[in-house]
Amino acid sequence: MLIKPQSTSSFPLNWDAIFPEKNPLAVEIGFGNGKFLKTLETTGTNVVGFEVSLLSVEKAMKVIDHTKTALLLMDGIWGLRELFSERSVDALYINFPLPWPHKKHASRRLFTLPKLQIYASRLVDNAILQLQTDVKEYAEEAIRNSEESGLFSLADYAVRNEVQVGTKYEQKWVSQGKKIYKVVLRKKRHVSVPNYLDKEVIMPHAIVHDSHGTLKAGTYRTTFGTIKLWEPFSNNQAMLLIPAIVSDDDFIGVSLQQRVYISVSPHREGFIVKLDNHADVFKTENVKSLIWLIANQISNGNIKRINVQPPSKLEYEPA
C-alpha cells in the first residue's frame, strides 16, 4: 500500500490502524528495488519502507504484499521522526546508503549523533539497527559513532563477497568484486526526541480585505528554513495561484522540501489565502510562514483574520 501522510489530521500515525494484522513493525530507509522489503515480509512483521525515488516506489508497488508493506515517498529520517511514536519500531534497516565521503557533506551521513538519537528514540528497547554498505570506512564510522553515543552496542559485524538478498546495489557491488559490510547494532539506551510537526494539524489560512498588493518573488529565509516564491498565475475569476518551494531546515542536515501551491480566491469577507485544494503537503512551520508572507504582501498588511504567526526572522533576496 502507498501511504500519503500529508493529508492526515494528527501525528504520529496509528500504524495498528493502517495494517490489517497487528505484528512487530520493521522499517527500511531507502528500499531501492524493494527486494529487501520482500525478505522482511517473510519474517512475520509489518513493514514500512521509505524512498525518495518515485521510480523505485512505482517498481516496489508491483512486487510487495499490500497487506504487509506500506511505502512512503519521502525522506526516511524525517518520516521516522514524524510518523512514529517513541518505542514503536521493532527493527530498522539501512541498506547501501550514499556514503557522502567528502568532509563538507559529513552531516548528511546517516550515522551522525542527531540521527542516532532519532533511531534510538523510535526503536523499542533492545531492538536492532542494521546497516549494509560496500564502504568499509562507512561501516567503521557507523560502529564508532554508535558506540560513542552510548545509545547502541555492536551485536554483529560480518564481511561477505556474495549476494544474499539481491538488492540492486548489492548485486552491483558484488559483481565489481567489492565486499559487503554488515553491521548489526542493538539499542542500549533510550533517548527522547520530540516531533517537529504539531500533533494536531490545523489548516493554515488567512482572510484579507483585498488582494491588490504586490507579491515579491524571490528567496526568503525565515526562522524555520527557506521559501522560494514565484510570480502568481491568475484567471478572470479574480483567483491567484502562487507556486513556491518550501524547505523546513530544523535539524541534522536533512531538510523537508515541498512544492507548495497557495490559492487566493474571493470570500464573503474579502479574500481567503490557503493551500490549494490539490496541494498534498505537510503543514509545517515554514508552510505556515508562507501563508502569512503571502497574506501580508497581497493585502499590504491589511489582514483581517489569520490562524498562524509571522516568523520571527524574515530575510529577502530578490529573484
UniProtKB/Swiss-Prot annotation:
Keyword hit for Cell inner membrane: no
An annotated Gene Ontology molecular function: tRNA (guanine(46)-N7)-methyltransferase activity
GO cellular component: tRNA methyltransferase complex
Residues noted as binding substrate in the record, renumbered to the chain: D134, T167, K168, Y169, E170
Record-listed E.C. numbers: 2.1.1.33
Domain of life: Bacteria
Pathway recorded for this protein: tRNA modification; N(7)-methylguanine-tRNA biosynthesis
Enzyme class: transferase
Keyword tRNA processing carried by entry: yes
Keyword terms of this UniProt record: Methyltransferase, S-adenosyl-L-methionine, Transferase, tRNA processing
Catalyses which reaction(s): guanosine(46) in tRNA + S-adenosyl-L-methionine = N(7)-methylguanosine(46) in tRNA + S-adenosyl-L-homocysteine
Residues that bind S-adenosyl-L-methionine: E28, E51, D75
SUPFAM superfamilies: S-adenosyl-L-methionine-dependent methyltransferases
HAMAP family linked to this entry: tRNA_methyltr_TrmB
Homology family: Belongs to the class I-like SAM-binding methyltransferase superfamily. TrmB family.
Function text: Catalyzes the formation of N(7)-methylguanine at position 46 (m7G46) in tRNA.
Protein name per Swiss-Prot or TrEMBL: tRNA (guanine-N(7)-)-methyltransferase
Organism: Coprothermobacter proteolyticus (strain ATCC 35245 / DSM 5265 / OCM 4 / BT)
Name of the encoding gene: trmB
